[in-house]
């Protein structure tokens, strides 16, 4: 009888284990109940999602905006640098020493007396010489004088522009008659247009020969005078320094000469002493 009871206990434990397993499976496979959600809860959830989306977009826009601002500042800096470089180039183009487009002023010089007269403008001394040459010819014709046979004249100009070195320029000018006269319209000081006819053309060449003594000879500018004086003074000072300082070879030659003289004098003194002993 005891054996049957023990077997029944085993069977009961097995059945209990199976029942617990089935309960667990039933719990896991419970059907999902239909949950009723009100409209207010749905709206609240939508508002929350919208707010979170705004925060995310705001953060992203802030980050992108900061980067764009940095890049914008860099571009602004580069723009300012380019503007500075542009201002430098405009300065060099508009004015300065290297600007050849600005007007310069010159005066004609009489080679015999050395007096200057007239005032002629031009970007280069050659242009001013052409204007001065035409003025001289008109003056000679008005006074009834005779033009030179060759038709060539020497013209001397001195620059009178403020800040210039007052350099003197020499040119040879001739006239050539045109086959057909040229007519050019020019607006006068009163605002009316005037027609000027040109029958001659000026041909001007620079003269490389030295200037007359009345005009200062070769000394055509103040800068050349100053440079010549400094060169002369420099050569004199260098010569005096060289003569004052003796070289090492000269010192060595003097010392060897003194040694030879001393040895000769010693030999001369010893010779008579030997003769006396004999």
Swiss-Prot record:
Region (Disordered): 1-107, 206-278
Signal peptide: none
Compositionally biased tracts (Low complexity): 62-94, 264-278
Biased composition (Polar residues): 249-260
Coiled coil: none
Compositional bias of kind Basic and acidic residues: 1-11, 97-107
Name of the featured protein: Uncharacterized protein R252
Organism: Acanthamoeba polyphaga mimivirus
